[in-house]
Each structure stands twice: as C-alpha cells, then as structure tokens.
Regions:
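Flexible, active-site-adjacent loop/turn segments at secondary-structure boundaries
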Residues: 36, 63, 100-103
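C-terminal interaction surface of TIR/SEFIR-family domains
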Residues: 91-154
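Conserved beta-strand-loop-alpha-helix hinge of the TIR/SEFIR fold
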Residues: 45-74, 78-89
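Eukaryotic short linear interaction motifs
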Residues: 4-5, 89-91
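Conserved N-terminal substructure of TIR/SEFIR domains
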Residues: 1-48, 139-154
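Short C-terminal domain-edge/linker segments immediately following a structured domain
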Residues: 25-30, 52-53, 82-88, 111-116
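Short, glycine/charged-enriched secondary-structure capping and boundary segments
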Residues: 10-14, 67-70, 95-97
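Contiguous, function-dense segments enriched for cysteine-driven chemistry
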Residues: 15-18, 36, 52-53, 68-72, ...
Length: 154
C-alpha cells in the first residue's frame, strides 16, 4: 500500500507511547481473516487508546478501514487529530497531499467537524518538498501535536 513505509517510519520514531508497531505481515494476517476479524481487531485496539492519530497520506481518505477507525473514535468520543505524511520519503520519493479524511464522519459529510490536521511538510527554496527537513519537523513536533486531538461534543 502506498503509505506503508511512511507509517512504519513514524511508528519507529518511538515518540508516541503505548503505540505497538504492527508490521505489514501482522496486518496481512489480520486482513486475510475477513471483515469481521478486522473490525473486532480495530475495536479491541481502540479500547486502550487515549487518542487516535490519523496519519494522512494521498489515499488515506479512501481507505475503508481508516474511515471505520475514524468513525469509531468519533462515536467513542476519543480525541482525534490528523498528521500529514506525504512529505516523508518512501522508497526515495515524496507524494502529493491527500484529501481530509475527517470530512467523511457521519453527519459531517463534506466538511471537517473541527478536528486538527498538522502538516510537518517543509518545502525547499524551489518549492520542492525537503523530506529530511519534513522528517525532522515531525520529530520536533509529534509529541506536542499528539496531545491536541479534539473530541466529539454531545
């Protein structure tokens, strides 16, 4: 999948406490067992999370299980926030920005219900993305951003 390397890069930073690293093989094992197993796995993981951070790549908003996790967190009144990851290098390349996945929350179709999205992307002098500076910007700010999620109000 398009952003797997970027997501693993962030998880390996070790800056978010209590976040287990699920490698691609483990995810494939869960995914191979079907939709109900995936939903149950997400539900179980979410029970123990203080907040949900959505790592937003180019295709994140179109992924059904990401949408499920966002809606589940919203309904459970878990703090939610997004961090854009398109500016991180994956296989030596950066990507284009993806759409806001929070616009698909039930009752808010087409608009973000006030959830923060942080973008660590740093552009060089010529306007191209500097992936190393973007990585460092993310390292410098991830902890503070992770505590700024917003919850559903009534």
């Amino acid at each position: 999948e398009r952003d797997v390397n970027r997501v693993q890069l962030i998880r390996q930073m070790g800056l978010i406490e209590g976040q287990p690293i699920l490698n691609a093989q483990e995810w494939e094992s869960v995914r191979a067992r079907g939709s109900s197993v995936i939903a149950n796995w997400i539900d179980e993981q979410m029970k123990y999370k203080a907040a949900v951070i959505v790592l937003i790549g180019r295709e994140t908003a179109s992924r059904p299980w990401v949408r499920y996790e966002i809606q589940k967190a919203w309904d459970a009144r878990k703090p939610l926030l997004g961090i854009r990851i398109h500016g991180l290098s994956s296989m030596g390349a950066v990507d284009t920005i993806g759409p806001d996945p929070f616009t698909q929350i039930s009752g808010f179709e087409g608009r973000n219900p006030g959830l923060p999205i942080f973008d660590p992307t740093v552009s060089g002098v010529l306007g191209d993305i500097d992936s190393k500076a973007t990585y460092q910007n993310l390292v410098d700010h991830l902890r503070s951003w992770s505590s700024q999620g917003r919850v559903r109000q009534a």
